[in-house]
Amino acid sequence: MAAIGEKLQELEDRGVRLEDLAKNEEFISAVMHASNIALRTHQQEKLEALRNAVLNVAVGQAPDDALQHMFFRWIESLSPLHLRVLKLFQAPASQPGLSMGGLNSVLEHNMPELRGKRHIYDQVWKDLYSSGLVNTENLHVTMSGNGLTAKRTSELGDAFIAFIADPAMAAAR
């Protein structure tokens, strides 16, 4: 959580008043959620997602309370692998020269550590789909090259990715 303090200092340097945040109930709730989750993980990707979520609340780039609650729950329950797969399929890159195939080939091309581990990535995908974060149920349907590079995250998935993204990076886009 020290990283949050450093980033808050950067926000103060850019004009965010920390006194106002100290009185902001939404921000205080976000810090409490993030702190509780952070105490139960050592995974750097999750700690970074928590830091970014709190910072997005601080700068007013967060969804309503109901979505924030869901998003914090997903940060806690999804693995770093889930987060990487979700981000990959927001803008998937296919193998050069691949004219058709399944999304599993895109996954294995971009994440070679998952080659031959269908039992793992199928479960990860099932979790993402059942949470409504991706819009395609199955990784193993044959499709065209254009289909392989089509965005697979849902509107909810995009909102979740934005919530756990560094607000400084989002502002730079």
Positions of predicted regions on the chain:
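Long, helix-rich, hydrophobic modules that act as membrane-proximal anchors or helical bundle/coiled-coil regulators
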Residues: 40, 44-173
